[in-house]
Amino acid sequence: MSETHLSTQRFADLPLHAEVIQALNENGFEFCTPIQALSLPVLLKAKDIAGQAQTGTGKTMAFLVATFNHLLTTPAPQARELNQPRAIIMAPTRELAIQIAKDANLLAKHTGLKVGIVYGGESYEVQREVLDKGVDILIGTTGRIIDYVRQGVISLNSIQAVVLDEADRMFDLGFIKDIRFLFRRMPDASSRLNMLFSATLSMKVQELAYDHMNDPEKVEVTPEEKTSKNIKEEIFYPSTEDKMRLLLTLMEEDWPEKAIVFSNTKHSCENLWSWLEGDGHRVGLLTGDVPQKKRIRILEQFTSGDLDVLVATDVAARGLHISDVSHVYNYDLPDDCEDYVHRIGRTGRAGNKGVSVSFACETYALNLPAIEQYIGHSVPVSRYDREALLDDIPTPVKIHRKHPTSRTRDGAKGAHRSGGARPPRHRTRRPS
């Protein structure tokens, strides 16, 4: 993590439980990020907060540290039963819930607190078996949590800490009725530590906070610009005919360490996967139709470096928190301005540099003026030499074909390879 992304506040200087400090030290957390430095002193006084912070700012560790510390320093309710978690963390997507649980397990190692996770798309009974053994901190999506509450599998009568993450996305996805349902089944707000985090503290988000929290203090870490200065943005104006060849040429030129390619439709994503796979890239496909187990496997492969490229729709990519994404390619400009910010925000995180490349094609170029107005600046235009685009592109792979997951860059088999390192190919020349 870049030091410029951190504050001067040390975790060790905060009044945290010794076991929390030990877990932070073991995982390399010494200095707080700005949102952690602002929110933890408030939360450690058992005061509620409504925090405004973008993804990639460290807000997840902020509320996890506060949650673990609160449970370790506050006695559990005397009448608590095995099916009653002490803390609940609600997330808008299963991918975000999985990431939160992964981070929570880093802190749970020395505390004796049990972490459980529930979300749709996975076996109801398998997740129930975990709950039946008892969990202290329950992480999940609202729909699956409600299922277990209604079935009497869990009770929220002993909740002592509540986290609502990405509240603005909860509104976007229509989950607010679910959230209010769950809040009404918890102890009074005055007997809980309540935390809400959102990229924007709109009036509807603030109303939710004040309805179900105890006079929360507003904590804001708002960037001066909607897009990070760490991200180099550029845009091309390709013809429909050139669009795919331009993407493949740029990806060969950039040779990104880890890239996400966004498109607006499932069909377009499948087409992109076919061409990228045919060209020898190690690529995963993430659309709404991909089964949950396969989604998890693809994300694990992408995170570990077994896949270099992820092709995704906006809906399928919501809630993803993957570090070290070097490049984002907007094959289609999104129809929603906020989606542009969310897309390119996958790179340039935690103080790292990132690159965003967008295509303003004949179909989606009309989306650009609204996007530029929303982000407050023009995206620099880059030009390409049509004659320099790749002309030896292999045939795309059919989507139903089972493709190998063990492919590597060196020695990968493809129509343009004869084995060994990738041979040199024509490249576009872009202005520096």
From Swiss-Prot:
Sequence motif: DEAD box, positions: 165-168
Any GO BP annotation: RNA catabolic process
InterPro entries membership: DEAD/DEAH_box_helicase_dom, DEAD_box_RNA_helicase, Helicase_ATP-bd, Helicase_C-like, P-loop_NTPase, RNA-helicase_DEAD-box_CS, RNA_helicase_ATP-dep_RhlB, RNA_helicase_DEAD_Q_motif
Keyword list, A-Z: ATP-binding, Cytoplasm, Helicase, Hydrolase, Nucleotide-binding, RNA-binding
UniProt xrefs under PANTHER family: ATP-DEPENDENT RNA HELICASE RHLB, ATP-DEPENDENT RNA HELICASE RHLE-RELATED
All residue ranges annotated as the Helicase ATP-binding domain in the record: 40-219
One GO MF term: ATP binding
Broad EC category: hydrolase
Alphabetized SUPFAM superfamilies for the sequence: P-loop containing nucleoside triphosphate hydrolases
Compositional bias (Basic residues): 423-432
Subunit details: Component of the RNA degradosome, which is a multiprotein complex involved in RNA processing and mRNA degradation.
GO cellular component: cytosol
Compartment annotation: Cytoplasm
EC identifiers of the protein: 3.6.4.13
Protein name: ATP-dependent RNA helicase RhlB
PROSITE patterns attached to this UniProt entry: DEAD_ATP_HELICASE, HELICASE_ATP_BIND_1, HELICASE_CTER, Q_MOTIF
Residues at which ATP binds: 53-60
Motif extent (Q motif): 9-37
Function summary: DEAD-box RNA helicase involved in RNA degradation. Has RNA-dependent ATPase activity and unwinds double-stranded RNA.
